[in-house]
Amino acid sequence: MRKLLVLTIAVIVLGTLFAAPRYVLRFNHVLAATEPYHEAFLKWAKAVEERTKGDVKIEVFHSAQLGVEEDILEQIRAGAPLGQNTDSARMGMYVPPIGVMNIAYFIDFMGAKTPEEVIEALQKVKQSPSMKKWLDELENKYGFKVLSFFWVQGYRHFFTHKPIRQPADLAGLRIRTPPSPAWQESIRALGAQPVAIAFGEIYTAIQTKAADGAELTYANVYNGSLYEVVKYASETGHILLINFEVVSSKWFRSLPPEYQKIIEEECDKAGIEVSMKIMKELSEQFKQKFIEKGIIVISDVDKAAFMEAAKQAYIKLGIMDALQQLIKEVMGQ
């Protein structure tokens, strides 16, 4: 009886050991647990675990639970089994041309107008010779493996106390931006004065007139209750935030090739799914909620004038050549 008990315990212990994942990735992002992205990251993690039969486990941490983005990226460079949701502006700090993807009107310069065309354009960008070269440099020189950048968060517009229809309307306005040089140069090129303010401080900044407005998505503005401190939403659609999902190239190379493929495939799939949902459904829903709060939407914007003005940002940042090369490779122009 005792031998049987010992044998049973041994079988249970061995079974537990074999059931444990061989590879674990801790994935960090700064968004709240209620955001569509968090749900999409969880879906990606579940799909990977199922397809690898439990060999690969991705643990998702929302609200920057593992730390601030800058610290996590440095740990990733050092080879830690971590992942981070970031953007091309941040990756452009290592390989400058990659930052082109988060400059004003990038996706428009790629010829994309509909959500479907946005995803198609990004797929072509990923397959372009230039992007492959830049991604290889990120991976081999700086230790960042980009799993996917088919993750977009919707178009950003200007939310202010006055209507914005052309670049001249932004003259003298202090517009809140993230502290990224690429972002700030974009807003400066469009005619405004960029002011770096933390996301959580935007409401107070506009309320106290430390800033005259912000450039955000409808979802950002609604969730932050900014409809209480602005009057107009001017639909410039100047930036479509393209997110990069990155992990350590050292960790990624430790995986069997078939697992590498699964992780990338499922990351692309989850990203496209949530991006389409945001662009086709959620953005419009938040816009309608915004209107219900009494905010005036300005849709008759001179987009051509804004796109022309935006070119100065590419020139100032020294990446106009990168933009023109991608236009040639993606659009054949």
Regions found by a protein language model. Name each.
Residues 1-24, 333:
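Short, low-complexity disordered leader/linker segments with a strong preference
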Residues 19-120, 137-333:
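N-terminal secretory/targeting leader peptides
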Residues 119-135:
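Signature of the catalytic double-stranded beta-helix
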